Amino acid sequence: NHYKTPMAAELLKQGLINVHTPCDNLVASFLKKNIENKKFEYVHEVLEALGKIPEYEIAKKQGIGPRLFAGSPENYCGRIAITEITGGTEGSAQMYEKLAAAGVGTIIGMHMSEEHKKEAEKHHINAIIAGHISSDSIGINLFLDQLEKKGIEVVANSGLIRIKR
């Protein structure tokens, strides 16, 4: 029911704004800065670095944290690309051939279909699935931190892993 939330806001005479995509952009920038631009030799090092991010650390304890979906922890990671974090679910399955040609050896995304996994494996790309809710939590936390700085009270709910930075 796409109209459930807007209709509830209207009944409650509350304003409503959807910040999902901007928050996805925030987590993509966060991961680029903290993971993609770092030097890692092996895939397990990338997984360990992700596991030190509080939202992912908590998600891991819940059984929904970052995991390797394609490849091996002992593989060289090569260049890292943050993919499928923002802009919808999945792009074209043909992107893996282009990513491999560009020297990308490891991708990090929120989720991945079996078709995409097969294409990643075909082109020897390691695929780390960071997790949807934990990744969303990073982005929304970065946004909420800014609201709190402006004096807006934040009450976490709906599965948000609230971490203040």
Which stretches of residues belong to each language-model region?
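Non-catalytic interface/targeting segments
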Residues: 1-109, 114-115, 119, 125-165
